[in-house]
């Protein structure tokens, strides 16, 4: 029996058309909501779903590309305090974390999801490039300038 999957399962992804045993389809897949019977009406419903998903995918990609441009135009500036000990070693107090990067981006009206920036702890002076995951394969490179203020 041919069925159209309505959810991802071990037999395939959502909206896939598969062939399974009649009993499996009638007694498990269809009653549990994992599939619907293959028919012209259900095929039209599937095509409509696929076109809606395609439009949604396109919209998300375009928003991610706009956000990518905004992020790549930015250069965030942070200052950390440091001290020099008796042996002339530099000790930086603290670091710039992922949370601080997100807070600074919010000041520029850029809101990211929780896992967009991998765990970052910057404590070395200079310019750093942090990769930001926006959507599937779309990533932005955020420039972070870190200045260390040495106190004696």
UniProtKB/Swiss-Prot annotation:
Q: Which UniProt keyword terms apply here? A: Ribonucleoprotein, Ribosomal protein, RNA-binding, rRNA-binding
Q: What is one Pfam family matched by this protein?
A: Ribosomal_L9_N
GO biological process terms, alphabetically, are: translation
Q: Does the keyword Ribosomal protein apply?
A: yes
Renumbered to this chain, the signal peptide range is none
Output the SUPFAM superfamilies linked to this UniProt entry: L9 N-domain-like, Ribosomal protein L9 C-domain
Q: Which InterPro entries match?
A: Ribosomal_bL9, Ribosomal_bL9/RNase_H1_N, Ribosomal_bL9_bac/chp, Ribosomal_bL9_C, Ribosomal_bL9_C_sf, Ribosomal_bL9_N, Ribosomal_bL9_N_sf
Q: Name one GO molecular function term.
A: rRNA binding
The entry's cellular-component GO terms read: ribonucleoprotein complex; ribosome
* Biological function: Binds to the 23S rRNA.
PANTHER family cross-referenced by the UniProt entry: 50S RIBOSOMAL PROTEIN L9
Regarding protein family, the annotation reads: Belongs to the bacterial ribosomal protein bL9 family.
Protein's name according to its UniProt entry:
Large ribosomal subunit protein bL9
Origin species: Mycoplasmopsis synoviae (strain 53)
């Amino acid at each position: 029996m041919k069925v159209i999957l309505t959810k991802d399962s071990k037999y395939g992804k959502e909206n896939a058309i598969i062939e399974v045993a009649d009993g499996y389809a009638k007694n498990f897949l269809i009653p549990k909501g994992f599939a619907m019977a293959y028919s012209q009406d259900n095929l039209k419903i599937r095509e409509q779903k696929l076109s809606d998903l395609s439009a949604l995918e396109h919209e998300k990609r375009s928003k991610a590309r706009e956000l990518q441009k905004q992020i790549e135009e930015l250069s965030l500036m942070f200052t950390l305090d440091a001290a020099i000990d008796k042996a002339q070693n530099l000790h930086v107090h603290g670091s710039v974390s992922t949370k601080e990067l997100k807070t600074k981006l919010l000041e520029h009206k850029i809101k990211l999801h929780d896992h967009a920036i991998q765990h970052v702890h910057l404590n070395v002076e200079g310019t750093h490039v942090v990769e930001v995951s926006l959507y599937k394969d779309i990533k932005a490179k955020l420039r972070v300038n870190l200045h260390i203020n040495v106190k004696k």
